[in-house]
């Protein structure tokens, strides 16, 4: 019943991240630099603090989630799982020195593996297609339950992540392009296509999580 929240959140994320791409390509500034340069100091500091809180909240959920997954799969104690997760995060950061493109390729491979696992599970579950499609129809009554409302808020926050907007506006500048208007337009089209593909795959994974949980 909350698949429509996943779809709506994905559309919002596509819109906001496309705007961040446009900012980065058109001005050469990422979102943080643009805020620092164009906004009063009284606005900049709260925005910075909110971004830090969002990063900590997201990382905490991912850290604990990975530790729980390691416990379920291999029986590892939670503290050991947390340490292993923190270590592999540092390893990924260290891989940046080999170039951002290689790091992107590694992340894409991992995401593809996760997507393949969910695809296999969906084939094994064989959910009712009509029920799944019906979940894409917005229903406000599904949010009257407090637990459903909290879940919907979590889905929205996990899809439209504030710190991702800062990150994406910076990452689009790692690609080299000429300074002419035509090349910038081409870079913008490529960045928008990249955003749509990435968030469409994220939508499929998030939708699969809900369907599998319901099954």
Regions inferred by a protein language model and the residue ranges of each:
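Selective recognition of specific alpha-helical transmembrane segments in multi-pass small-molecule
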Residues: 3, 7-12, 16, 160, ...
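Juxtamembrane transmembrane-helix boundary signature
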Residues: 5-37, 49-53, 57
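Inter-helical loop and helix-membrane interface segments of multi-pass membrane transporters/permeases
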Residues: 65-81, 122-150, 174-184
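Hydrophobic, small-residue-rich membrane helices and short re-entrant helix-turn-helix hairpins
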Residues: 1, 141, 166-201
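Membrane-interface loop-to-helix entry segments
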Residues: 84-85, 95-125
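Transmembrane alpha-helical segments of multi-pass small-molecule transport proteins
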Residues: 48-52, 73-95, 113, 117
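Hydrophobic alpha-helical segments and their helix-loop junctions in multi-pass secondary transporters
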Residues: 89, 111-143, 149-170
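Select transmembrane alpha-helical segments in multipass membrane proteins
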Residues: 4-5, 40-53, 144-156, 204-211
């Amino acid at each position: 019943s909350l698949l429509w929240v996943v779809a709506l959140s994905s559309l919002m994320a596509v819109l906001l991240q496309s705007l961040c791409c446009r900012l980065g390509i058109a001005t050469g500034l990422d979102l943080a630099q643009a805020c620092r340069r164009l906004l009063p100091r009284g606005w900049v500091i709260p925005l910075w603090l909110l971004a830090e809180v969002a990063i900590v909240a997201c990382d905490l959920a991912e850290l604990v989630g990975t530790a729980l997954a390691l416990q379920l799969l291999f029986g590892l104690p939670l503290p050991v799982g947390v340490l292993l997760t923190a270590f592999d995060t540092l390893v990924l950061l260290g891989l940046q020195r080999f170039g951002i493109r290689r790091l992107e390729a590694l992340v894409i491979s991992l995401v593809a593996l996760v997507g393949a696992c969910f695809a296999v599970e969906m084939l094994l579950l064989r959910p009712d297609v009509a029920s799944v499609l019906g979940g894409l129809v917005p229903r406000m009554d599904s949010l009257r339950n407090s637990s459903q409302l909290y879940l919907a808020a979590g889905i929205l926050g996990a899809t439209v992540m504030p710190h991702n907007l800062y990150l994406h506006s910076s990452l689009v500048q790692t690609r080299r392009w000429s300074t002419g208007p035509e090349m910038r337009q081409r870079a913008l089209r490529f960045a928008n296509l990249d955003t749509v593909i990435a968030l469409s795959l994220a939508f499929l994974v998030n939708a699969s999580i809900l369907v599998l949980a319901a099954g």
